[in-house]
Curated annotation (Swiss-Prot):
Catalytic activity reported: RNA(n) + a ribonucleoside 5'-triphosphate = RNA(n+1) + diphosphate
Assembly behavior: Part of the RNA polymerase complex.
One example GO MF annotation: DNA binding
Function: DNA-dependent RNA polymerase (RNAP) catalyzes the transcription of DNA into RNA using the four ribonucleoside triphosphates as substrates.
Name of the protein described by the UniProt record: DNA-directed RNA polymerase subunit Rpo6
GO cellular component terms, A-Z: cytoplasm; DNA-directed RNA polymerase complex
Alphabetized SUPFAM superfamilies for the sequence: RPB6/omega subunit-like (SSF63562)
One Pfam entry name: RNA_pol_Rpb6
Transferase recorded as keyword: yes
Gene Ontology terms: biological process: transcription by RNA polymerase I; transcription by RNA polymerase II; tRNA transcription by RNA polymerase III
UniProt record similarity statement: Belongs to the archaeal Rpo6/eukaryotic RPB6 RNA polymerase subunit family.
EC number: 2.7.7.6
Species, as recorded: Haloarcula marismortui (strain ATCC 43049 / DSM 3752 / JCM 8966 / VKM B-1809) (Halobacterium marismortui)
Enzyme class: transferase
């Protein structure tokens, strides 16, 4: 998690990516995990999640 990202934003990213993976999206990293949420967490840690957060202040 970067310094400006809240835990809610992280949770939203991980949940969205896990849903994509559960529906058959390709995995972006090499991993031994088979559960979508664990794969999403590894992708997040590797910095390869295909999401950005646009805040409207």
């Amino acid at each position: 998690m970067n310094a400006q990202e809240s835990r809610y934003e992280k949770a939203r990213k991980l949940g969205a990516r896990a849903l994509q993976l559960a529906h058959g999206a390709p995995v972006l990293i090499e991993t031994e995990h088979t559960q979508p949420i664990l794969i999403a967490a590894e992708e997040y840690d590797a910095g390869v999640l295909p999401f950005t957060v646009n805040r409207s202040d």
